[in-house]
Design a protein with these regions (language model features):
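N-terminal subdomain of nucleotide-sugar transferases
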Residues: 1-64
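Acceptor-binding helix/loop patch of EC 2.4 sugar-transfer enzymes
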Residues: 8, 73-83, 126-162
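Short glycine-/acidic-enriched loop or helix-start segments at secondary-structure transitions
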Residues: 15-16, 47-48, 80, 119-123, ...
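Conserved donor sugar-nucleotide recognition element shared by glycan-biosynthetic enzymes
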Residues: 17, 88-92, 160
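A conserved catalytic-core segment of Leloir-type glycosyltransferases
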Residues: 39-94, 98, 103
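An aromatic- and histidine-rich active-site surface loop
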Residues: 84-98, 108-138, 142-143
């Protein structure tokens, strides 16, 4: 099966999600699947795009036997809520354009749903390609942000709750 793994975090980043996602990719390859990855330029946790990746909007290349599509991101300079939102949205928009124009012939789009805004991108690319969409939900959004006190705006909470339900109802 040909699988596109869609995630904001991927090596050479060394944060938790990038590590387990890389392990998942390697395990699926060992099981005989073909893998491609659509991800952001590495920037976490420093908040700046890593050397060797700077100054690019898109990049395609093979990394450890995997075709990796990297898409522009505005790295968050701080851990502040709105900086992270801007970062999430920048990757959402750039990955939509890259995914819809460059990804070809996949059977499944396995999406790590952080941020929530990646769901509609995965669904749009999946519809274009006739691929099934699987969501991997790591955090309970938007409830984690609400509980931490980072999200208090009632309108924004309703929008994110709507997006959460939309994602669940449109995944395969």
């Amino acid at each position: 099966m040909k699988i596109l793994l869609f995630t904001q975090y991927y090596p050479p980043e060394s944060v938790g999600p990038a590590i387990w996602i890389n392990e998942l990719v390697q395990d699926l390859i060992k099981r005989g699947h073909q893998l491609e990855v659509l991800t952001a330029f590495p920037n976490h946790p420093q908040g700046e795009v890593f050397a060797g990746y700077r100054g690019k909007i898109f990049q395609r290349g093979e990394e450890n036997g995997v075709e990796v599509y990297r898409s522009w991101i505005h790295p968050p300079k701080t851990r502040r809520f709105w900086q992270r939102v801007l970062s999430f949205l920048s990757f959402t928009v750039s990955s939509f354009f890259y995914g819809i124009t460059k990804i070809r012939e996949v059977d499944v789009i396995y999406t790590v749903l952080q941020p929530l805004s990646l769901g509609p991108v995965a669904v749009a690319v999946g519809k274009k390609l006739g691929a099934r969409v699987v969501l991997n939900i790591q955090d309970i959004h938007p409830y984690a942000a609400i509980q931490m006190g980072a999200l208090k705006n009632p309108f924004l909470i309703r929008v994110l709750e709507w997006l959460e339900l939309w994602n669940y109802s449109h995944a395969d």
